[in-house]
Each structure stands twice: as C-alpha cells, then as structure tokens.
C-alpha cells in the first residue's frame, strides 16, 4: 500500500539562555528537547553544539520553544530564519528588527523574530505553539518592545501561546547551588511539556482508533462507510476527525479537504491549505496539521497491525 511521509510526533525550535551569563543565547531545533538540553549542558557526551560548550556559559536554560512543525525540514527552515533574521526571506525587509549580521543580540530581538516568523503565511498555517518555560521571558515577549504584533500585517494569529505551570520567574544565579537549582527545575519543565504532549497524542490516537474499530461510521460528506481496508486505495484509508474527541464527526480525509477548501476565504490559487477549518458538526476550530497527523498515523498503525496478522 502507498505510504505518506510521517509527521513527527514532536519537533520544535528552541531558545536557550545561559543561566550564569544572561546575555548569551542559542537557537536550535530538535525532535526531543529533553535529550537536546542534556546534550547542551554536557549531561550526555555525544551531541550538543560548539557554541554552548564555551567556558562559563553552561548550564543553559531552555526559556521558550516553538513546536508542532509538520516536518523536520519545516523546523529547520524556521530555525535558519530565526538565526538569520537580518536576511531571511520569511520576514519582509521593512519588518526586520535585526538589520545586520552582528545585530539582534538581545532577548527582545530574539523574541520579536519569533512573532515575525509566526505571522509569515508559510508558518501561519502550521498552527504552531509558542511555549514559555520562564514567566519573565513570556512577559518580555508580551511587552513587544518593537511593536511587531501591531506593525506587521497578518489576517489572524493561527498560533497558540502557552506557559508552563510553575514556570521559572526571576533567576537567582549568585551561587553554584542557585544555578544548579534553576537547571534542575528547567529540565523538569521541559520534560513535562515533552512527555505530556506525546501522551496526549497517544491518548487521542487510541480514541480515534476505537471509533474506527467499533460500530459503524459513515463519512460526513459522501455517506460511505468508514472502515480500514487493506486492499483499498490510500484515500479510502485516511480519515479526518474533530479535535474534540467527544464529537462524532468522522469523514474521509479527501472529503474533508474538499469541504474545507470550498469554505476558505482566500482564492484557491493563493492557498492549498484549509484556513481555520471548523468541524461541520460541533464547529470546533480544527488544526489542519493535526488532522493530517492523526490521519496518517492511524493509517500507518492499522497497516502495521494488518501486516503482523499476515505473518502469524
């Protein structure tokens, strides 16, 4: 059976800030922020970046992360644009808060570039999440020193902003014990976000799988029976669900795509991604990338299960 490229369970672009040298920053990307942070801080011998090994900068605090990228390539594009805000094509020249290669060293510049990139039409429709592990950093972002959120055009904000429960605030780095305490607490916050995100996706996937495996479901649009069919073509085995797992909406992915595109506000030639689609049953706002993620993931899991049955 034909296969689609898997959307990663997690992929994010993060901002590190040195706990001991608060004016030192690092931007990177990873599918596993916990492992990556340990690498940067030297807890794991392999990995890490040369710049984060410089004397006096370790340990690092992960203060923010943008996650939910549909592919590694998309995350790397965001990372490169964030690192090169003075020349990236994803920020219009007149909107750049960083003008030169050596500019943009402050945290205000780093955070402003996040907003600029999230407002770009390429990243907007990925329905990304900007998460803060440090409340003080979130406040700096909200303060918006360069007025990026007001001065740069955008139809709407398709991204979510969140803050860790018990997020760090003012950093006390007077002693080694203080620094290590911040390091430990930050690692716990990163671990919690990563594990919770994966656990929620696993739970949701199981609920969707149960809907398909039990009872008789028909497509909301074409009224054909929804059922995994190993001998069928790929379009018959990709399904769309509502993000509200209590909603009974289910359809073929292709049918949902046609419906959402027919209701999009922009001309068809301007976009190939449904904009802010709403469930036709309960009107919950859907994240199209999540709809695709669960559709492909469910198909792959069902195909794998069928293959195992054949070998028994």
From Swiss-Prot:
Entry keyword annotation includes Protein biosynthesis: no
GO CC terms: Slx1-Slx4 complex
GIY-YIG domain sequence ranges: 9-92
Cofactor: a divalent metal cation
Parts of the chain that traverse the membrane: none
Gene3D superfamilies reported for this sequence: GIY-YIG endonuclease, Zinc/RING finger domain, C3HC4 (zinc finger)
InterPro entries: GIY-YIG_endonuc, GIY-YIG_endonuc_sf, Slx1, SLX1_C, SLX1_endonuclease, Znf_RING/FYVE/PHD
Main location: nucleus
Enzyme class: hydrolase
GO MF entry, a single one: 5'-flap endonuclease activity
GO annotation (BP), single: double-strand break repair via homologous recombination
Zinc finger residue ranges, SLX1-type: 219-282
E.C. number(s) listed in UniProt: 3.1.-.-
Subcellular compartments: Nucleus
Alphabetic keyword roster: DNA damage, DNA recombination, DNA repair, Endonuclease, Hydrolase, Metal-binding, Nuclease, Nucleus, Zinc, Zinc-finger
Function: Catalytic subunit of the SLX1-SLX4 structure-specific endonuclease that resolves DNA secondary structures generated during DNA repair and recombination. Has endonuclease activity towards branched DNA substrates, introducing single-strand cuts in duplex DNA close to junctions with ss-DNA.
Oligomeric form and interacting partners: Forms a heterodimer with SLX4.
Family listed: Belongs to the SLX1 family.
Protein name per its UniProtKB record: Structure-specific endonuclease subunit SLX1
Organism, as annotated: Candida glabrata (strain ATCC 2001 / BCRC 20586 / JCM 3761 / NBRC 0622 / NRRL Y-65 / CBS 138) (Yeast)
């Amino acid at each position: 059976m034909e296969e689609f490229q898997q959307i990663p369970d997690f992929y994010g672009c993060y901002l590190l800030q040195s706990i001991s040298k608060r004016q030192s920053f690092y931007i990177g990307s990873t599918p596993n922020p916990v492992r990556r942070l340990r690498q940067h801080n030297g807890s794991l011998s392999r990995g890490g970046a040369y710049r984060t090994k410089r004397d006096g900068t370790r340990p690092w605090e992960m203060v923010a992360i943008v996650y939910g990228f549909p592919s590694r390539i998309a995350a790397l594009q965001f990372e490169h644009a964030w690192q090169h805000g003075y020349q990236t094509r994803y920020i219009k020249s007149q909107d750049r808060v960083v003008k030169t290669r050596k500019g943009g060293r402050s945290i205000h510049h780093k955070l402003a570039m996040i907003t600029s990139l999230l407002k770009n039409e390429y990243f907007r429709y990925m329905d990304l999440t900007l998460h803060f592990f440090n409340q003080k950093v979130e406040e700096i972002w909200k303060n918006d020193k360069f007025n990026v959120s007001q001065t740069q055009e955008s139809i709407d904000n398709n991204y979510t902003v969140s803050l860790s429960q018990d997020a760090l605030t003012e950093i006390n780095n007077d002693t080694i014990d203080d620094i290590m305490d911040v390091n430990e607490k930050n690692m716990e916050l990163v671990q919690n976000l990563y594990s919770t995100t994966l656990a929620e996706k696993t739970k949701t996937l199981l609920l969707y799988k149960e809907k398909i495996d039990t009872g008789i479901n028909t497509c909301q649009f074409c009224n054909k029976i929804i059922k995994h069919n190993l001998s069928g073509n790929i379009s018959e085995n990709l399904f769309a669900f509502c993000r509200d797992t209590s909603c009974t909406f289910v359809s073929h992915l292709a049918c949902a795509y046609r419906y959402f595109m027919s209701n999009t506000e922009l001309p068809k030639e301007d976009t190939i991604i449904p904009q802010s689609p709403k469930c036709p049953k309960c009107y919950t706002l859907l994240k199209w990338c999540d709809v695709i993620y669960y559709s492909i993931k469910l198909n792959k899991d069902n195909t794998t299960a069928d293959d195992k049955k054949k070998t028994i």
